[in-house]
Amino acid sequence: LPLGGTARGTKGAPPSAGADKARQIFVSIASYRDEYLPFTIDSALSQAVHPDRLTFGICWQADEGESLARFVDDPRFRIRRYPYQASLGYGWARAEGQRLYDGEKYHLLIDSHSAFAPGWDESLIAQLEGKPGAKPLLTTSSPPFTFDAAGNVVLPWAGTEQDGVPLMTCGVIRPAGWLDIQMSRERKVERHQQTPFICCNFVFTHGAWIRDVPED
């Protein structure tokens, strides 16, 4: 895929032929020279119960030495590639990725350096559909992770069942108006809480959100 180009996979059957859009998840990723982007994609696919129901919209800000060749021809992928020097920031990059949305029922907005839990796709859909209201949205600041000597993902906390869910808090409002969003490991809960914040490194909701509240 040349710099400045857009690719949609053409080999094989398109996802809509094997999976109804009413069950699909559109995974939107903005990546800026992130060496973990291929890992993030592989993790999403390998840990999903239904990888055939995933589609990806990626704004890939890269140099000529970076490659996503093994994904370019996959019909689940829609990729816009830009020279990293031409980047206009993360808001612009997320907007570019979301412009590749094509009517999938669900939308996951995720960082390009993310690790996925087994069965994440069915789990997120069940959590979302169990919430009241016409337009529920799940969001948090995703926990950091590292790798052990064998290359396995190591998380600082295990998740809902073992440790509870760390709360997203705002400890500081900076002079320029920025909110300093942090995760509180001391305050953990066993169920979802309402929050005044959205953290764009993890948002899961219905796909209509892209059209109702587009990134700019």
Segments and roles (model prediction):
Residues 9-216:
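Catalytic cores of eukaryotic secretory-pathway lumenal/extracellular enzymes that build
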